[in-house]
Structures are given as structure tokens and as C-alpha cells.
């Protein structure tokens, strides 16, 4: 039996340290970001490579594909060598697999990696979970601004590596790291709806909000946007055809192009808003309406003529749901 030492920094992880030849001091630089890597190899190979002084490579954590097992190799307080010029302020972890093969990115791996990120977010470094990248995956390098604190190797400046690449599901990862905020539910048949700044002020930075339009007994809901303005390509409104973020996505909107008029296929629409850490805008104004079937039961009144008839006669009744009807 091989004795495995447990990490004292992250309980679920195994502690298997890299040699001192492969990491160094942060020299006082504060930790402020997380780097997501794909090793282009196996879990065991990543551990072995970081323990080889000839590699001049290390990472704080390695995540296994099959079951999400994690090995810690460098203390978070130390500078691992994984993202070049951006090493001093980042914590890096490698994920087993290859960027061209999505089968390596298993649910177990996503969940284990996200749990690790959640732990680091709560460790006092000042890394907000909301600042996880959630945009489309891409090939090549794609530098993302400093507002985004949890992102891929390919998203940092001065890089040539392109991991985790086109097959990493950033939206999934964002949702695993971030709990859904409390939903504000609107049940009136119609009304006005504004961003958090109201009618006349901007929304705020670092927002994630959910609003559910679900009028009582409605068969459809319509949102009519009369104005719309968010920070283009940074602050987004998502509209879902249903009562959760797992419902079909109707659209994702940013900038000054209005969503226009949106109608649900059922009795609910969910609206989600996400803003980044800088630059706000006027937001939006919406009038919403809904179709609610008439649920008032019909009532009938019969006039008693007190007059016995031996021939054809007329009976008149009034239905609240329709016009008066006369029957013979």
C-alpha cells in the first residue's frame, strides 16, 4: 500500500510536492487570479513532469479526468511556473487531457475543478466567483481583460499556449462555481420592468440577477423592450423560454441592440443579467404583458314566466362569458 499524504491547504487533494528547483517565491506579489490549463497529457505524466528539475515547470494543482482526483504540487503561497510572466499573481491547475479531444473534460473533472475554485474564492485572496469567464471557447490565444479573474492559459497576455481550448465549456464552469442568486418572481399579468438602477440610473458593477415573469395562469408572456443599453461585449442580458436557466435560451444581448419584443412559448420567461467589474450603462426599460385565459365559470339565470304553455315557447338565459342567447 502506498501512503498518500493529504494536502493541508485543500482537504480533498493529495499532497505530492514539486522539488524546489521548479518553483519560487512570489516575492510579496498578492494572489489575484486563477489559471485553467490542459496538460496535453495524462494526470500521472503531469505530476512526473513537474517533479523533474529539467522541466522548469510546475503548477499548484493537477486534476484527473476519470474521477476528479486532485493532487497539489505547490503551496498556494509560492509561485508555480505555469503561465510565464503572469506567474507571480496566479494560482494554476492542470487538467488531464488534450485540447482537441472533449472526452477528457468529464463531469467529474468539471465538478472537482469548480469545487477547488470555490475553495480558493473563499480563501481571502479577493477573487470573486462572478469574475469567472463564461464566454465562448476558442482556439488560439485570446487575451481577456483584468476584470476576469478565473480564465484559461490562452486568455492571459504574453502567452503562446492555447489551452484549455475550443472544447472547454466555460458557461458550465461558471455555473458550477457560482450559486444561482435568489430569483425575483413577478406574477402580475402586466407591468413595467427596469434594471437595478430603475428608470433613470445605471445598473451596478459585478451584478448577477435573475427575474422570473410567471403571471398566474398565464399561457404566454411578452416582454417589449422600449430601451436597452449595456456595456458592449462585457455586460449581458440572457432571456430563457421557461422558469430556469436550464430552459431554452432565447437570446443573449449586449450593447445598444435591443432584444425588441420577446414572447414565450409557455407561461414563464426568465431574465438573467451579468455585469463585469467596470463601466456601467443605462440598462433597460420593459413593458410586459401576458395572455391569461378567462377562468370565470359561466352562470345562468332563468326567468320563470309562471305561465303554462302547450305550444312552442322561448327560454332566455345569459352567460357571463358570452352574449345573451335565446333558445326555443
Labelled PLM ranges:
Residues 181-293:
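Domain-level representation of secreted and single-pass membrane ectodomains enriched
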Residues 1-17, 23-27, 99-181:
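Basic/polar, cationic surfaces and motifs that engage anionic cell-wall
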Amino acid at each position: 500500500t502506498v501512503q498518500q499524504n493529504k494536502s493541508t491547504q485543500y482537504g480533498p487533494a493529495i499532497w505530492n510536492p514539486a522539488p524546489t528547483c521548479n518553483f519560487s517565491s512570489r516575492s510579496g506579489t498578492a494572489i489575484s487570479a486563477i489559471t485553467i490549463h490542459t496538460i496535453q497529457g495524462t494526470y500521472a505524466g503531469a505530476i512526473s513532469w513537474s517533479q523533474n528539475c529539467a522541466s522548469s515547470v510546475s503548477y499548484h494543482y493537477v486534476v484527473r479526468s476519470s474521477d476528479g482526483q486532485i493532487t497539489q504540487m505547490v503551496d498556494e503561497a509560492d509561485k508555480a511556473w505555469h503561465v510565464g510572466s503572469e506567474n507571480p499573481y496566479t494560482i494554476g491547475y492542470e487538467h488531464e487531457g488534450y485540447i482537441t479531444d472533449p472526452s477528457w473534460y468529464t463531469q467529474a473533472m468539471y465538478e472537482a475543478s469548480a469545487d477547488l475554485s470555490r475553495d480558493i474564492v473563499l480563501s481571502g485572496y479577493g477573487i470573486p466567483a462572478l469574475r469567472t469567464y463564461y464566454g465562448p471557447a476558442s482556439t488560439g490565444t485570446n487575451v481577456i481583460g483584468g476584470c476576469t479573474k478565473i480564465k484559461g492559459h490562452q486568455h492571459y497576455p504574453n502567452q503562446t499556449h492555447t489551452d484549455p481550448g475550443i472544447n472547454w465549456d466555460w458557461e458550465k464552469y461558471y455555473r458550477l462555481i457560482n450559486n444561482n442568486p435568489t430569483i425575483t418572481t413577478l406574477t402580475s399579468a402586466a407591468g413595467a420592468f427596469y434594471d437595478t438602477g430603475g428608470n433613470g440610473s445605471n445598473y451596478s458593477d459585478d451584478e448577477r440577477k435573475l427575474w422570473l415573469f410567471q403571471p398566474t395562469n398565464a399561457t404566454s408572456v411578452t416582454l417589449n423592450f422600449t430601451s436597452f443599453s449595456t456595456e458592449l461585449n462585457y455586460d449581458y442580458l440572457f432571456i430563457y423560454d421557461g422558469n430556469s436557466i436550464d430552459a431554452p435560451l432565447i437570446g443573449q444581448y449586449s450593447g445598444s441592440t435591443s432584444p425588441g419584443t420577446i414572447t414565450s412559448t409557455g407561461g414563464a420567461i426568465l431574465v438573467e443579467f451579468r455585469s463585469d467589474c467596470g463601466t456601467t450603462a443605462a440598462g433597460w426599460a420593459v413593458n410586459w404583458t401576458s395572455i391569461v385565459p378567462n377562468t370565470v365559470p359561466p352562470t345562468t339565470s332563468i326567468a320563470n314566466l309562471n305561465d303554462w304553455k302547450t305550444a312552442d315557447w322561448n327560454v332566455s338565459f345569459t352567460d357571463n362569458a358570452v352574449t345573451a342567447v335565446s333558445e326555443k
